[in-house]
């Protein structure tokens, strides 16, 4: 470090000496003086300027999503971008059962898992083992809630119909009590009552001839 500093001072001193010599004495030619000055200045600047360090920029590889590269069991990608799910039914000699078309591979994989768990139970090989049975339980809960709501609605409708029928029967009974129509049965009861001692309107005694006309009075016993 000290030697380079000393060398730089010597070069600066030599440049000053050349300038002084040019001012006080004459050089053989102006070109010789210019070339000497250029050599001194360039050598001085090259020593002062530190070398540039080359920095290597790392190249980043394109990020590829794991979901696009992973192959799920029972899932196939269609040419138009959708994902189809299917499963082999052991009860039908391994016949493929179509499960539907999904927008993403994960949805199709979950559809396969649901069908596989329903067919094979705990022995099924699933894409998402930690989610085994969750979708099935959720579906059962929804069905149970739907059935309860349906039963409650049916009971309410039955009660409403029963109340309406009772109200209609009451109204019919009231109308019959207010105005009893003349029917053959009612006339039959009327005539049957005429044979009794209390004959209603027919209980009036027979009229005898008027005595003022000279007829004797008839008494009916």
UniProtKB/Swiss-Prot annotation:
GO biological process terms, semicolon-separated: ethylene-activated signaling pathway; response to heat
Entries under InterPro entries matching the protein: AP2/ERF_dom, AP2/ERF_dom_sf, DNA-bd_dom_sf, ERF_plant
Location (main, coarse): nucleus
Pfam families in alphabetical order: AP2
Record's subcellular location: Nucleus
Keyword match Cell division: no
Gene3D superfamilies xref list: AP2/ERF domain
Organism domain of life: Eukaryota
Any single GO CC term annotated in Swiss-Prot or TrEMBL for this entry: nucleus
Ranges annotated as DNA-binding: 71-129
GO MF annotation list: DNA-binding transcription factor activity; transcription cis-regulatory region binding
Keyword Acetylation: no
Keyword field: Activator, DNA-binding, Ethylene signaling pathway, Nucleus, Transcription, Transcription regulation
Cited function: Probably acts as a transcriptional activator. Binds to the GCC-box pathogenesis-related promoter element. May be involved in the regulation of gene expression by stress factors and by components of stress signal transduction pathways.
PANTHER family xref list: DNA-BINDING DOMAIN, ETHYLENE-RESPONSIVE TRANSCRIPTION FACTOR ERF105
Homology family: Belongs to the AP2/ERF transcription factor family. ERF subfamily.
Protein name according to UniProt: Ethylene-responsive transcription factor ERF105
Organism expressing this protein natively: Arabidopsis thaliana (Mouse-ear cress)
């Amino acid at each position: 470090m000290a030697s380079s500093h000393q060398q730089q001072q010597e070069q600066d001193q030599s440049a000053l000496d050349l300038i002084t010599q040019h001012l006080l004495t004459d050089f053989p030619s102006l070109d010789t003086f210019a070339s000497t000055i250029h050599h001194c200045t360039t050598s001085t600047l090259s020593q002062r300027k530190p070398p540039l360090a080359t920095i290597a920029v790392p190249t980043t590889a394109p990020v590829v999503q794991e979901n696009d590269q992973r192959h799920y069991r029972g899932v196939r990608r269609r040419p138009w971008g959708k994902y189809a799910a299917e499963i082999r039914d052991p009860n039908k000699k391994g016949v493929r059962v179509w499960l539907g078309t999904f927008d993403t591979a994960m949805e199709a994989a979950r559809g396969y898992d649901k069908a596989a768990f329903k067919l094979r139970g705990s022995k099924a090989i699933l894409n998402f083992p930690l989610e085994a049975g969750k979708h099935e339980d959720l579906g059962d809960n929804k069905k149970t809630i739907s059935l309860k709501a349906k039963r409650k609605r049916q009971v309410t409708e039955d009660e409403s119909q029963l109340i309406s029928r009772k109200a209609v029967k009451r109204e019919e009974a009231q109308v019959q009590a207010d105005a009893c129509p003349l029917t053959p049965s009612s006339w039959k009861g009327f005539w049957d009552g005429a044979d009794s001692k209390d004959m209603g309107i027919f209980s009036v005694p027979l009229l005898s001839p008027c005595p003022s006309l000279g007829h004797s009075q008839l008494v009916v016993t």
